[in-house]
From Swiss-Prot:
Native species: Nicotiana tabacum
Organism placement in taxonomy: Eukaryota, Viridiplantae, Streptophyta, Embryophyta, Tracheophyta
This protein's UniProt keywords: ATP-binding, Kinase, Nucleotide-binding, Phosphoprotein, Serine/threonine-protein kinase, Transferase
E.C. code: 2.7.11.24
Protein name, as recorded: Mitogen-activated protein kinase homolog NTF4
Keyword Nucleotide-binding assigned: yes
Gene expressing this chain: NTF4
Database matches in CDD domains: STKc_TEY_MAPK (cd07858)
Length: 393
């Protein structure tokens, strides 16, 4: 879920010391968004920037636009039945592109399967007023205040305790995700949501994959700056270690307030990471195919830089953990469980409060070439699970 979420004046509290308030992002003078009852009062239509936003009548005014992405608009709204504020994402013409539709279905199924404090929860899939005219998908998520990307680019001070606490929560959520036999594959600061008391939740599972799957899916380009070397080199046999690499990049960006490897393109990305971690040895390249090995051998030889010298302001224990995350060979990269048990996180680590998912996620629905109509039906059923009263309407 992209885009900033609900604004708050609350000061973030309780990672340690003075906490940062989420950056304020005023929305241009929107106090009064026109609302019209529709479909016999069962739905309300809002007109937002010339776009129709049609939700069930329990989402009463006021409604506030809080983000916009390629997929459409995100609004905050109050569910009058539960008295909970939610972020509603509208995916317009959700079934026009089969890959996009499958991505939406995957995200819904994954988030409904997962139940963890550090993973954003789906609160509702809003059913369409008429089944036969089902084109737009509305997903309501629990509402968060901001995201890590907004915090990093703001001028607010972040204490080391903040960064440590954010890292711990990312790893805690990732432990659960990996235990469900799932890779996130697109971890980046904007996919890490925060609320006013520094709670962090991982979102955007549209690119997630089963951990045992070996074919490299190229339907979407994962954000380049956080991509593990094995993905940059088109290794088809990638593992949960790809997410650990992303976490290392994100943590250093938090500590340094700028991206660690801001590559302009594929080639530049690989060069940047080798300039820091050095050219891999033949032993470290064992997992790569011959083409990838040949490519690396013809590059200039890079000597590994000292992380301690390059980042003198970062706690040496944190540096030690990051070096283990940013290991070229995924087979030697630290696992999430071992990262949680690293001395840097001793003050936060509690294995009895780091749950795993008891049932692996089943990606079987991906194995079939679903038609547009079948995908509509599957998402419609997810909506009915939240709104059984619409079953016979």
């Amino acid at each position: 879920m992209d885009g900033p979420a609900h604004q708050t004046d609350t000061v973030m509290s309780d990672a340690a010391g003075q906490q940062p308030a989420p950056p304020s992002q005023p929305v241009a003078g929107i106090d009064n968004i026109p609302a019209t009852l529709s479909h016999g009062g069962r739905f309300i239509q809002y007109n937002i920037f010339g776009n129709i936003f049609e939700v069930t009548a329990k989402y009463k005014p006021p409604i506030m636009p809080i983000g916009k992405g390629a997929y459409g608009i995100v609004c905050s709204a109050l569910n009058s039945e539960t008295n909970e504020h939610v972020a509603i994402k509208k995916i317009a013409n959700a079934f026009d592109n089969k890959i996009d539709a499958k991505r939406t279905l995957r995200e819904i199924k994954l988030l409904r399967h997962m139940d963890h404090e550090n993973i954003v929860a789906i609160r509702d899939i809003i059913p369409p007023p008429q089944r036969e005219a089902f084109n737009d998908v509305y997903i309501a998520y629990e509402l968060m205040d901001t995201d890590l990307h907004q915090i990093i680019r703001s001028n607010q001070g972040l204490s080391e305790e903040h960064c440590q606490y954010f890292l711990y929560q990312i790893l805690r959520g990732l432990k659960y995700i990996h235990s469900a036999n799932v890779l996130h594959r697109d971890l980046k600061p904007s996919n890490l949501l925060l609320n006013a008391n520094c709670d962090l939740k991982i979102c955007d599972f549209g690119l997630a994959r089963v951990t045992s799957e070996t074919d490299f899916m190229t339907e979407y380009v994962v954000t380049r700056w956080y991509r593990a070397p094995e993905l940059l080199l088109n290794s088809s046999d990638y593992t949960a270690a790809i997410d650990v690499w992303s976490v290392g990049c994100i943590f250093m960006e938090l500590m340094d307030r700028k991206p660690l490897f801001p590559g302009r393109d594929h080639v530049h990305q690989l060069r940047l990471l080798m300039e820091l971690i050095g050219t891999p040895s033949e032993a470290e390249m064992e997992f790569l195919n011959e083409n990838a090995k040949r490519y690396i051998r013809q590059l200039p030889l890079y000597r590994r830089q000292s992380f301690v010298e390059k980042f003198p302001h970062v706690n040496p224990a944190a540096i030690d953990l990051v070096e283990k995350m940013l290991t070229f060979d995924p087979r030697r990269r630290i696992t999430v469980e071992d990262a949680l048990a690293h001395p840097y996180l001793t003050s936060l680590h509690d294995i009895s409060d780091e749950p795993v998912c008891m049932t692996p996620f089943n990606f079987d629905f991906e194995q079939h070439a679903l038609t547009e109509e079948q995908m509509k039906e599957l998402i419609y059923r997810e909506g009915l699970a939240f709104n059984p009263e619409y079953q016979h309407m």
